[in-house]
Amino acid sequence: MEIKKINDQKVQYFFEVSSKELETQLASAYEKIKPKVEIKGFRKGHVPRKIFENRFGKDNLYSDALENIVQTKYQEVLQKKDFESMGMPQVIDLDEKKLKDNQNFTFGLEFIVKPKVTLKKYLGLEITKDDLEVTDYEVEEKINSLLEKQTTLESKTQNDFLELTDIAIFDFEGFVDDKPFEGGTAKDFSLEIGSGQFVPGFEDQMLGMKQGQTKDINITFPSDYHQKSLANQKAVFKVTLHQIKTKKIPQLTDNLVKSLKLVNASTVEELKNNTKQTLLAQKKHKEKENVEKQVIEQLVKNSELEIPQEIVSQEQIRLQKEFEAQLKQQNLTLEQYKQYLGIDDEKMEKEFSQQAQKNIEYQLIMEQVAAQEKLTISQEKIEQKYQNLSNHYKVPVNQIKQNLPEKNLKHSLLMGEALELVINKAVVAK
């Protein structure tokens, strides 16, 4: 093993791998896939490796073997504890020809050295807090929102006018320069007047219309309109109003509350009390997030650290993959998401990069706080957290442990305790 220090941020380790070690890993790689291999003339799982290689080639086996070798050498370096690394090392100077010729070959691993963090002030930080008070007005607004969900619609008469909050059922066709445009036509469209769902000015001009009436509505698309070709364009919409419906909000009574079958609330008084407690809990949660943000911003400002771009890039890739997985669960792609929000690749990449930078800063600073304060996480706390997660997600503890390695959970708990310590030592400004 040869070691080369490039600078304070990078260290390279070089290894020589014998053909014997390579062959051992190739055999191991094939044994892993052998049970699934099917070739005519052989029983499934009993295909000789030579036959497999002649039919499908060796690339996959070499790739798997190299991955195992890299992991082995990586662990060897970590066990030496010569330095603290961040992220995954990069494979460098791989002699691929000798590798695929089953000869002794060499390769290197380039590690990013964990940056040094100099903490200045981290205890006694000054923070601000809001008064945690829930007003009767806030409770009333929340309950009104609940009542609106129980709203029924009643049709207005032929002579009634269209008013604010009414639901209009209408056809429309839009024209720019006397020509219809894509997306500018709809039949039996339903719109709550005053909701602001349409282009500014559209809903205002519909006020006062009667059922059966046709009217031209003139608007100008805003400069930031999502359909770029229509931005700043003047348009005329021919609107035919078919039906007007008005919302009927039920009266708040004990009987209504009972009919809603809410948890811990069967009377108006209980509903008000529960609503107040819910709003208070939300405010406490929001305040907690606000305090954490204040503390982290001050810690970053009060710290000296230089983060290698490679680490930020690795975290950026991780964040993007994680986000794409979340979108996939909602049957969305990243491209669809960007199109929906009207953002381009550059803006999306910038957002991921900024978040990655913040994540790494937070991790390094909290690790330094934990080290300076000699914080530790007991096995009891780890097991308790596993149990809490099991109860929350209603899955067995063993399944939680499979998805969340103890090392990762321990690190997360340590970061949380470090942050909690700094917050508890903070001073609230008066």
From Swiss-Prot:
Q: Which Pfam families does the protein's record reference?
A: FKBP_C, Trigger_C, Trigger_N
List the catalysed reactions. Answer: [protein]-peptidylproline (omega=180) = [protein]-peptidylproline (omega=0)
> Could you confirm whether the keyword Cell cycle appears in this record?
yes
A Gene Ontology BP annotation from the UniProt entry: protein unfolding
Entry keyword Cell cycle: yes
Q: What is known of its domains?
A: Consists of 3 domains; the N-terminus binds the ribosome, the middle domain has PPIase activity, while the C-terminus has intrinsic chaperone activity on its own.
Protein name as it appears in the record:
Trigger factor
What is the organism of origin for this protein? Onion yellows phytoplasma (strain OY-M)
